[in-house]
Amino acid sequence: MDKNEDVEIEYWCNGNKRSEVRYNCNGKEEGLRTDWYESGAKEREAHYKNGIAEGLRTDWYESGAKKMECRNKTWEDRLGNTYTNLHGKKTEWYESGAKKSECKYSTGRITGIANTWYESGQIEFEIPFKIGVRHGVEIKWSESGKIESEDFYEEGRSKGKLPLNYTSKNWPTHK
């Protein structure tokens, strides 16, 4: 650790660590921040740069199972304003360890195909996005694997449901 950094550690009443935060010489969060549940199990790890979330963030359930993982990226505009957005893949899991959802972000906007799953592992939704809005055919499956609905979106606006016997593979999708 740099001699110009300070570490602040907070504890729960039972003596377990609650959080560990590093600060730079300007008093802003810098590096890895870790939070724990009162039980002592790790709750979250997030990286900071000059007080702003930057890089990998991981959350866990109190049981120790991974809950969520994403990345943050910091941007600065021409006026010097700083923004932090999700950037890259975001994944969530059920406490059982089964994947719950997965999507991708580009400068804070969801893009491409977002998927959600039932805890059984069966896909629940496939949702196409283009620059943060729904665009293309959104498909919903039942837990048994049967397609329940197909809705067409264009630039974020619903254009209606497709007939259930229609093959969505032939419908135009997000590119």
Enumerate the language-model features and the residues they cover:
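Glycine/tyrosine- and acidic-biased, solvent-exposed loop/turn segments at the edges of beta-strands
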Residues: M1-K175
